[in-house]
Structures are given as C-alpha cells and as structure tokens.
Amino acid sequence: MTRDEKISLNQLSRFKNKFDLISFSPKRITVPKIFDKTLHFESKYFKNTSTYSRLLLETKFYEKFANYKFILIYQLDCIVFSDDLKFWCNQEYDYIGAPFFRNKYFPSFGLSRVGNGGLSLREVEIFIRILKQKEGPNFWNFLFNKLPDKSFLNLKKRFAVYREISRGVKWYTENYTLNEDLFWSDRAKLFYSNFKIAPLKVGLKFAFDMHPKFCFKRNKNTLPFGAHGWQKRDKTFWLEILRDIND
C-alpha cells in the first residue's frame, strides 16, 4: 500500500463504529484491519479499470449488499472531510458522485453532469432493479421524452443509441465499453426513468474530482463531503487542506 493510499484509508477511519466498513477484493489479498468484513470476487475483475467497471455493472455485486439501503463506493484515491454520510443517505438520491466537466482541460467550460463513481453513493435496491430490467425503453417515450434536441443529426445519433439499448440492459451492460460511472450517469435513466441522479449543485457539495480549486471556488469556498483522485488532482492543494482539518 502506498503512502497516499494510507492517507486515504486513514480518512476513512472517521466512519469506524458508525457504519459497516466492507472491502471488496480478489482472494489472497491482505486487507487492512480497519474493515469489518471483506467480500471476495473473481480476480478477473481486478486486472484494470475496464474489468473493474464490468464488476460494477453486475447484479451480483449489488446483491452482496442487499441488506443495506445505500453503499458508499470509496476507492483508495479518495478522502472524506466529515462523517455526515447519514445526511447524504437521507437526501434520497439513487446516485451521487463528483460532477464531470464538459472539458477536462478547461474548467471554465463548466460542469457537465453527476457523476464520478470513485467516491459515490448508490441506492442498492434501485441499482439491482435497473440491472434486472428485462426490456429496453419504449421507442416513442425514448424518442420524444428523452430528446430535447430534435435536429436530424441528434435524431440519427439517438436512433443508434436506441437500437442498442432496445436489446435490454443485460446485453447493453455486457457490451458497454466505457467506465461504469458513465453508464450510471448517462444510460441508466433510459432503462429506469425514475432513476434519481443528484443535480450538479448537490453533486458539487458531495464531492470534487478534477480541478479542485475551481470546484472549491464554485462551491463558495466550502469543502465537500469528500474528494476523488486527490493525489492526481492538485495534490499540494489537498495536502494543505488535510493539514488544516487534521491539526
């Protein structure tokens, strides 16, 4: 475990004795004692980002947490600044994560949508329900209710999307090639229209990912609940924050 991962794990300790801390990993991996329980999955899911995404698009993953209403995904490049996880659970969103940017190089282009899955809160029952959907969306509902832009080019693109999602969520997730959080941010609502994704303003209060200084200013100089990718996204900024709150 790297020094940065130890920092992330130490921040997670603020939840100890308040919530169940459960790790998931392949077998024969030594897990830190901070965790209350470890769930093992096949090693094929831990080879790279793509295989990890495959696991988080599997029903069996969420069924392991069927006794919980929510799970907080906390990768070891995350930090949290408070223990108010219960507050976020009480907001009753199905999915909350740090907002994506419209352009990852130019934050001035603005935020896009929620959100990054590295530090994310997920409503277990709803995730299972979506992944067990047998049919794709109704064509006319998809066409007219999901398309604010009715231009020809947009329609052409959306027809292609519909052709794929009409095969059902099982086929779609098995053939999905992007990171799993993009499915939950962009596609899940097509299979379950009541899927409640937190709006941008709420997502920003929950977590930062890229361009933390920009996000901090946008969030009225207020820290969020946590952050993802802190050691990759202006590490100096985050180390100063950690020194201030841990003094």
Task: Label every PLM stretch briefly.
Residues 1-53, 59-70:
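N-terminal anchoring/stem segment of glycosyltransferases
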Residues 23-24, 75, 97, 171-173:
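Short beta-strand segments
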Residues 25-27, 39-45, 97-100, 188, ...:
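Residues at the C-termini of beta-strands that transition into short coil/loop
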Residues 68, 93, 192-194:
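Short, high-confidence coil segments that cap the C-terminus of an alpha-helix
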Residues 68-80:
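Short beta-strand-to-loop acidic/aromatic patch adjacent to the donor-nucleotide binding site
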Residues 116-247:
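Catalytic core and acceptor-binding pocket of nucleotide-sugar-dependent glycosyltransferases
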